[in-house]
Amino acid sequence: MEELQGYLEKDGSRQQNFLYPLIFQEYIYTLAHDHGLNSSIFYEPMEIVGLGYDNKSSSVLVKRLITRMYQQNSLIYSMNDFNQNRFVGHNNSFYSNLDSQMVSEGFAVIVEIPFSLRLVPSSEEIPKSQNLRSIHSIFPFLEDKLSHLNYVLDILIPYPIHLEILVQILQCWIQDVPSLHFLRLFLHEFHNWNNLITPTKSISVFSKENKRLFRILYNSYVSEYEFVFVFLRKQSYYLRSTSSRAFLERTHFYVKIEHLIDVCHNHFQKILWFFKDSFMHYVRYKGKAILASRGTYLLIKKWKCYLVNFWQYNFHFWSKPYRIHINPFSNYSFYFLGYISSVLINPSAVKNQMLENFYLVDTLTQNSITIVPVIPLIGSLSKAKFCTILGHPISKPIWAELSDSDIIDRFGRICRNLSHYHSGSSKKQSLYRIKYILRLSCARTLARKHKSTVRNLLQRLGSGLLEEFFTEEEQVISPIFPKTTLFPLHGSHKERIWYLDIIRINDLANYLDWS
């Protein structure tokens, strides 16, 4: 990292114009390899079959790749050979796949440089509180807002988009022309979009080898459309909230209207009147977005039509209307940040007395509830090889070579993180099933290591060996948002706690979304 910073400090005014030579530096691929080692514990290392070592850490392959890139047209021939022999199983196809993987990882590290430089705090900047970055701080806000809304648009952000659009969007952030040409070459040589994208997923994802590069391109695309989207929302709302009667100089009001029309595109002028609801909330979570409104069904339907036209005219692809669902909040639940959130309607009757007359008033109260998604978590555990798809615990063979303390520590850490992350759940009893799966999976992993049975292992080591799986999570010194709410579920009080020290999604929920 010091070598990379030293390279960038050579010419601070033209940092973005000198990214392309970094492609031919060996330490770039070392950084990409280190990033892979720091990934989630649920990802298993990818090894070259028959060679017995990690392909990303092989300096021989990296130097061979750099030498081939220096040669004229060698990379093009390599990619074409890979496209022609991807189903043959030939060695050339195998090594071309490794080349494309290393190029993708290395180029992703290079593209991240302009973004990371903007995140480096200066010495004069006032340090911000880390608690404001907590994921859990979003839920108290949603609880206060969602219970007052009527309709929600469940949006699946459309894909695919044209490859050239991706390059043009990234061009707004990076002015290095050779790097953009290299990216265009890399994408168009792998022009078979169906091989890079899995259309059956809720979000289009690259293959496992190109996932990091895709995330950069995808986030750039989302940032571009949200910039225009939020701009229209703010400008139209500000225009609406400042009436001409409030101005002493009416000319300023008309000048503002003319300026807004000049900034907006032609079709934007026709849809500004859609934005009349001041209780509109937009939340995006990876490949999905939620647009909630307090308005009528007609208003939310206009939003749906606008979004379809928005993607069509701005990004030149058709967004299918069935990807945007209109749902009333009264009978709708959505998966968000590892929770299932919904609005619970509680009917109640209030007895009032006026003089000698008694009468009952029926009222409806809406409460936002969050529960643990047990079935998705079991599916995530199944993909991580902790259990079957039906939830039957199995051993973890890749961890059987570790020491007993390391095995127990890994399983225990997963359970503690789950309890800590899902502390805001309204029904914590659902976590007991997940903990049971992890506890038995740990026992079977230990039994596999010692070539014994689970019963004999527990009799020999003691049943208290795995008691920490059912204990509470470790005490964390952190500001919290305690919220005790009375729910008529089983007639008991449910205490929910939102911690302000959680800055990343739980690995199980994150693994489920991106795998």
Curated annotation (Swiss-Prot):
UniProt-listed InterPro entries: Domain_X (IPR024937), Maturase_MatK (IPR002866), Maturase_MatK_N (IPR024942)
Gene from which the chain derives: matK
Recorded family membership: Belongs to the intron maturase 2 family. MatK subfamily.
Organism of origin: Trillium luteum
GO terms for cellular component: chloroplast
Protein's GO biological process: mRNA processing; RNA splicing; tRNA processing
Molecular-function annotations in GO: RNA binding
Pfam families: Intron_maturas2, MatK_N
Localization per record: Plastid, Chloroplast
Name of protein: Maturase K
Organism superkingdom: Eukaryota
Alphabetically ordered keywords of this record: Chloroplast, mRNA processing, Plastid, RNA-binding, tRNA processing
